[in-house]
Swiss-Prot record:
Membrane-traversing stretches: 669-689
Disulfide bonds: C49-C61, C139-C158, C194-C212, C229-C247, C585-C619
Cytoplasmic side, ranges: 690-708
Gene Ontology CC entries for this record: cytoplasmic vesicle membrane; early endosome; endoplasmic reticulum; endoplasmic reticulum membrane; gamma-secretase complex; Golgi apparatus; Golgi membrane; lysosomal membrane
Membrane topology listed for this record: Single-pass type I membrane protein
Pfam families on file: Ncstrn_small, Nicastrin
Protein name, per record: Nicastrin
Native source species: Mus musculus (Mouse)
UniProt GO BP: adult behavior; amyloid precursor protein biosynthetic process; amyloid precursor protein catabolic process; amyloid precursor protein metabolic process; amyloid-beta formation; amyloid-beta metabolic process; cellular response to calcium ion; central nervous system myelination
Function as written in the Swiss-Prot or TrEMBL entry: Essential subunit of the gamma-secretase complex, an endoprotease complex that catalyzes the intramembrane cleavage of integral membrane proteins such as Notch receptors and APP (amyloid-beta precursor protein). The gamma-secretase complex plays a role in Notch and Wnt signaling cascades and regulation of downstream processes via its role in processing key regulatory proteins, and by regulating cytosolic CTNNB1 levels.
Subunit description: Component of the gamma-secretase complex. The functional gamma-secretase complex is composed of at least four polypeptides: a presenilin homodimer (PSEN1 or PSEN2), nicastrin (NCSTN), APH1 (APH1A or APH1B) and PEN2. Binds to proteolytic processed C-terminal fragments C83 and C99 of the amyloid precursor protein (APP). Interacts with PSEN1 and PSEN2.
Keyword Nucleotide-binding: no
GO MF term set: ATPase binding; endopeptidase activator activity; growth factor receptor binding; peptidase activity; protein-macromolecule adaptor activity
Length: 708
């Protein structure tokens, strides 16, 4: 009788099937990305419209959680909308909208037919001398300044002056579909070519499949209001091990410095008088983090930086009877975040300067678009009902006029009629205390800025242009006409601050440097990654500089690039290079006559050596510091506050845009049925093979002992 020895290992048929399945999965994992690249064309240079929230409502845009997809239709004139809104047979549509048609009228039509609209991709227009576009409201920061129904009701809600007369309010609307900005012309051309190749029918007939489609991802986690999203985030962070925060308050840092150093650990005595020079750092537009802000912010803070440099060069600044504080507020676009926080800190003893220390307040508004030599002085009519304040304001205006008399290119003008202050940080200080203050601006009534808080408030809007044949380094040092004009305004401001601080001997010698102004304008509006900005920053901040303009949206991750660059620019322009080593610069407490309470110390990259082979780092000592610009509403957990700004930004998981070819619904259905049938057939075959494995897969005999 013959006997054989067999094993008890896995069935050979099953082992083969497992190996085959593993190979298929591995191939799918390895080849998935390459297949996706063949199907989709990603759009890498886009900017989304995101959701923002305040105490009462939400604004902005979002997609569905899985993204929104639609057939692309190019709208180059308003008549093209008919296909999208009524005639097109393949809704929903993804509208590729020419920038010039991005108006309130068109958006209202699209908003009213959301069942046929999947989303919107907006191209950049080329503004001309007669065009205008401001997605902001006509009365910016309404309700958070000094005027209300109970105080100055005749000035409340911009009753006498619509400051932003051209504002269409689009940036403060809520859209249920995604809206993206296409920033790259080449990507726009690719989309239009895809549209022309696949989506244009012959002789007015409907196009045949496959069609060119676009998919936009911008799902927002927060809904309804700041109170709702903050409450949800609070509950998550309290009770969840892995909390999912759905929104964050808009926040950053204010930049401030003193003409004469003060001990920040103890603050000022009540009898010490301080002159405040203020301006704003931030701007915004309809699209996230696209905020060039040339006229609405950059020209003003560049002018103040140049004025600070000029004033610090005066020989007798250390003997002036009053100190000067330069402040650059963040978040003013969103209901005065920075200034309201500083006032709050001053009132509660959390800032070294108190409200009672403020002698006078000079603020720079929009100053780059003077239509003549005039620079207008705006004051508050309500606080001047107090005779003492009225006299102080009169002295302030007289000092400004005297300072301007020595600069023939600038003529200081008073308003002929009683008028409210334009949107300004001064309003938040006046809410807390009657002080003498003035806002300097290039407009007497409505803004001259036709692109207020829009994507087109760029260098070209304030006439900052360069000869085409110059290199970037030559552009950096090329003094433009705008730089000269702003330098003149900076000179007037510096001389006025000098006299307000008690100076008398050197006013006429104070002169702002046009070279400084032109470098700052170039860095903030044209190319941040330049040799001068590199020299004034710390080594680990180099990545903040890009070959593009800086954007001035406050955001939620702080400090932002703008804040850092302004901080170090101000330190470079007003501070002093010391002989401290890197270790001493990082810890100056061990060095005699150096104090962290009086100064800030920064180890910066420094200029190139003579051979331009390496930089010469140095330690800069200055009085420049940062102060938190987070609305007091979030400090106090008053998320429904009407006293303080409550703006928050929704979080999101993915921001993405891509195009691809889409098949007809019929073909998709057939593909699904065939795929499902193939799956069922495969399962049946697999089952049958597995059931008959002992017959189909016979194991070979193993050699063994044979007995007879």
């Amino acid at each position: 009788m013959a006997t054989t020895r067999g094993g008890s290992g896995p069935d050979p048929g099953s082992r083969g099937l497992l190996l085959l399945s593993f190979s298929v999965v591995l191939a799918g994992l390895c080849g998935g990305n390459s297949v996706e690249r063949k199907i989709y064309i990603p759009l890498n240079k886009t900017a989304p419209c995101v959701r923002l929230l305040n105490a009462t409502h939400q604004i902005g845009c979002q997609s569905s959680i899985s993204g929104d997809t639609g057939v692309i239709h190019v709208v180059e004139k308003e008549e093209d909308l008919k296909w999208v809104l009524t005639d097109g047979p393949n809704p929903p549509y993804m509208v590729l909208l020419e920038g010039k048609l991005f108006t309130r009228d068109v958006m209202e039509k699209l908003k009213g037919t959301t069942s046929r609209i999947a989303g919107l991709a907006v191209t950049l227009a080329k503004p001309n001398s007669t065009s205008s576009f401001s997605p902001s409201v006509q009365c910016p920061n309404d309700g958070f300044g000094i005027y209300s129904n109970s105080y100055g009701p005749e000035f409340a809600h911009c009753k006498k002056t619509l400051w932003n007369e051209l504002g269409n309010g689009l940036a403060y609307e809520d859209f249920s579909f995604p809206i993206f900005l296409l920033e790259d012309e080449n990507e726009t051309k690719v989309i239009k070519q895809c549209y022309q190749d696949h989506n244009l029918g012959q002789n007015g007939s409907a196009p045949s499949f496959p069609l060119c489609a676009m998919q936009l991802f911008s799902h927002m986690h927060a809904v309804i209001s700041t109170a709702t999203c903050m409450r949800r985030s609070f509950i998550q962070s309290t009770f969840s091990i892995n909390p999912e925060i759905v929104c964050d308050p808009l926040s950053d840092y204010n930049v401030w410095s003193m003409l004469k150093p003060i001990n920040t650990s103890v603050g000022l005595e009540p009898d010490v008088r301080v002159v405040v020079a203020a301006t704003r750092l931030d701007s915004r537009s309809f699209f996230w983090n696209v905020a060039p802000g040339a006229e609405s912010a950059v020209a003003s803070f560049v002018t103040q930086l140049a004025a600070a440099e000029a004033l610090h060069k005066a020989p007798d600044v250390t003997t002036l009877s009053r100190n000067v504080m330069f402040v650059f507020f963040q978040g003013e676009t969103f209901d005065y975040i920075g200034s309201s926080r500083m006032v709050y800190d001053m009132e509660n003893g959390k800032f070294p300067v108190r409200l009672e220390n403020i002698d006078s307040f000079v603020e720079l508004g929009q100053v780059a678009l003077r239509t003549s030599l005039d620079l207008w002085m705006h004051t508050d009519p309500m606080s001047q009902k107090n005779e003492s304040v009225k006299n102080q304001v009169e002295d302030l205006l007289a000092t400004l006029e005297k300072s301007g008399a020595g600069v023939p290119e600038v003529v200081l003008r008073r308003l002929a009629q009683s008028q409210a202050l334009p949107p300004s940080s001064l309003q938040r200080f006046l809410r807390a205390r009657n002080i003498s203050g003035v806002v300097l601006a290039d407009h007497s009534g409505s803004f001259h800025n036709r692109y207020y808080q829009s994507i087109y408030d760029t260098a070209e809007n304030i006439n900052v242009t360069y000869p085409e044949w110059q290199s970037p380094e030559e552009d950096l040092n090329f003094v433009t006409d705008t730089a000269k004009a702003l330098a003149n305004v900076a000179t007037v401001l510096a001389r006025a601050l000098y006299e307000l601080a008690g100076g008398t001997n050197f006013s006429s010698s104070i002169q702002a440097d046009p070279q400084t102004v032109t470098r700052l304008l170039y860095g903030f509006l044209v190319r941040a990654n330049n040799s001068w900005f590199q020299s004034i920053l710390k080594h680990d901040l180099r990545s903040y500089l890009d070959d593009r303009p800086l954007q001035h949206y406050i955001a939620v991750s702080s400090p932002t690039n703008t804040t850092y660059v302004v901080q170090y620019a101000l330190a470079n322009l007003t501070g002093k290079a010391t002989n401290l080593t890197r270790e001493q610069c990082q810890d100056p407490s061990k060095v005699p006559n150096e104090s962290k309470d009086l100064y800030e110390y920064s180890w910066v990259q420094g200029p190139w050596n003579s051979n331009r082979t390496e930089r010469l780092p140095q330690c800069v000592r200055s009085t420049v510091r940062l102060a938190r610009a987070l609305s007091p509403a979030f400090e106090l957990s008053q998320w429904s506050s009407t006293e303080y700004s409550t703006w928050a930004e929704s979080r999101w998981k993915d921001i993405q845009a891509r195009i691809f070819l889409i098949a007809s619904k019929e073909l998709e259905f057939i593909t699904l049925i065939v795929g499902f049938s193939t799956l069922v057939f495969s399962l049946i075959v697999t089952y049958c093979i597995n059931a008959k494995a002992d017959v189909l897969f016979v194991a070979p005999r193993e050699p063994g002992a044979v007995s007879y």
